[in-house]
Design a protein with these regions (language model features):
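C-terminal non-catalytic regions of proteins with extracellular/luminal or membrane-system context
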Residues: 1-154
Length: 154
């Protein structure tokens, strides 16, 4: 989890972790600020597959009147926190507060738009992920970004 330039969502990562933990999951959060730099490059895919059943990439990068284009920004060190393992470890992307992140992660086949970072929305998306309620409704925006890079077919 990484929030955007507004500092918009420093709590969403913790809210998501707590909701998943409450649902019975063991949650490890990737902390790019304190991790060992070599850790990213030394862990092989087999080690990661043993350690993780699922990867959830969550972004809370809200748009604003003077920031209408807000993109996912990976850490500077060779984009090391970009999910390069999506074909080996089931991976989902949850976008809070910005329905247009599909253009940044077309290689992740499960994409969920959660239009707010409120605790209510975090709890609701976890209920849907674990099957307590279904995904209903129709997106008010074009999450496929006009078929950029064939995202619909990834």
């Amino acid at each position: 989890f990484r929030s955007g330039a507004f500092g918009d969502g420093g709590t969403v990562g913790e809210l998501l972790k707590n909701a998943l933990s409450k649902a019975g999951f063991t949650v490890s959060m990737y902390d790019y600020a304190t991790m060992e730099r070599g850790e990213i490059f030394t862990a092989g895919i087999e080690e990661m597959k043993e350690k993780f059943d699922l990867s959830i990439v969550a972004a809370n990068v809200a748009t604003g009147s003077n920031h209408t284009t807000r993109r996912v920004e990976w850490i500077d060190l060779m984009a090391a926190n970009e999910p390069w393992y999506t074909k080996e470890i089931p991976t989902m992307f949850i976008s809070f507060c910005n329905p247009y992140h599909m253009i940044d992660v077309p290689f992740i086949s499960t994409f969920i738009n959660c239009y707010s970072s409120s605790s209510y929305c975090v709890d609701a998306v976890v209920e849907k992920i674990i099957g307590k309620s279904s995904f209903n409704g129709k997106s008010p925006v074009d999450p496929w970004c006009q078929e950029v890079w064939g995202a619909r077919f990834m």
